[in-house]
Amino acid sequence: MAAAALGQIWARKLLSVPWLLCGPRRYASSSFKAADLQLEMTQKPHKKPGPGEPLVFGKTFTDHMLMVEWNDKGWGQPRIQPFQNLTLHPASSSLHYSLQLFEGMKAFKGKDQQVRLFRPWLNMDRMLRSAMRLCLPSFDKLELLECIRRLIEVDKDWVPDAAGTSLYVRPVLIGNEPSLGVSQPTRALLFVILCPVGAYFPGGSVTPVSLLADPAFIRAWVGGVGNYKLGGNYGPTVLVQQEALKRGCEQVLWLYGPDHQLTEVGTMNIFVYWTHEDGVLELVTPPLNGVILPGVVRQSLLDMAQTWGEFRVVERTITMKQLLRALEEGRVREVFGSGTACQVCPVHRILYKDRNLHIPTMENGPELILRFQKELKEIQYGIRAHEWMFPV
């Protein structure tokens, strides 16, 4: 599909972007073009994983990558080239000051052998917003998506077709200023790499996780950058994840503020399915107030639930005090995280102030989680046609 043809899709999907945040040279009209894409096929193809061979997340890469360079004169020609190491100046601003951002999305191969991306325009919107926040160069989202489509098309034989598998797509944009000054970069590099990945829950099982909720650790704050997908948001979480493991938990429930608001689970958005204090059954997730990353799966679950019209769907602050009270009164049905890697992940225990809180997610089916997973699978693998899927 040519880039120009994507305009009809974007007319329905486009989100507002602060185009002028970093000055006029960041206008999207100054962009690389998919029509200029250069192609260099590898002469040394990698060995593809065999049938049934485990696909560990982020460990196996396809034969090719997309690369586009930028300087203060504009974007260079995009090129698909053999997968290779990068050459960076030791003073590169991405290495010293975390002038870097990334995205994560998946392509799925259906039984019809058609490969489809899941709502990629939302990732393009979010990536551009992240670029604006870091004063990195803007780009035309249509052109980048078409370049990504072409890359996947080149490496389409790497897209696994076993149940629950997919091709993970990782676009990255970094500042590449060869200087130790903290400033707006005059050089940047955009690249995209691909990884075949296995099922998050092997065999279709649903395994719940336990969470450490410690208010001493804060992932993001109002006025910060928690709502952008920046590399600098993730590195500091590794220590807290290790602390969770030491305390017998698999993930971290990130709290915020003096009232201990629930924000995210690990790198996932969080949902609570309960009967609210007013007696109404509802699905609630924290609002996009600058602390929450606007997840693609998060938005998809909200959209699906709104379409069903069977219970109230709301974006509202949730505090630990409210959750504790709801647990004591038996009003909580399910708590779960959502994200590109896992889609929907149930929670069965929260360690909070040295107290283990049992979450009855699994005792309740988990009815809603399984329904979400079933619908997502049918859409992503082309079992039923849906406007969310973008054919490669």
Swiss-Prot record:
Reported tissue expression: Ubiquitous.
- Which InterPro entries does this chain map to? Aminotrans_IV (IPR001544), Aminotrans_IV_CS (IPR018300), Aminotransferase-like (IPR036038), B_amino_transII (IPR005786), BCAT-like_C (IPR043132), BCAT-like_N (IPR043131), BCAT_family (IPR033939)
The record's listing under Pfam families reads: Aminotran_4 (PF01063)
Cofactor requirement: pyridoxal 5'-phosphate
Q: Which residues carry this modification: N6-(pyridoxal phosphate)lysine?
A: 229
Protein name stated in the entry = Branched-chain-amino-acid aminotransferase, mitochondrial
Species in which this protein is naturally found = Homo sapiens (Human)
Disease note: Hypervalinemia and hyperleucine-isoleucinemia: An autosomal recessive metabolic disorder characterized by highly elevated plasma concentrations of valine and leucine/isoleucine. Affected individuals suffer from headache and mild memory impairment.
Which PANTHER family does this entry report, sorted A to Z? Answer: BRANCHED-CHAIN-AMINO-ACID AMINOTRANSFERASE, MITOCHONDRIAL, SUBGROUP IIII AMINOTRANSFERASE
Q: What class of enzyme is it?
A: transferase
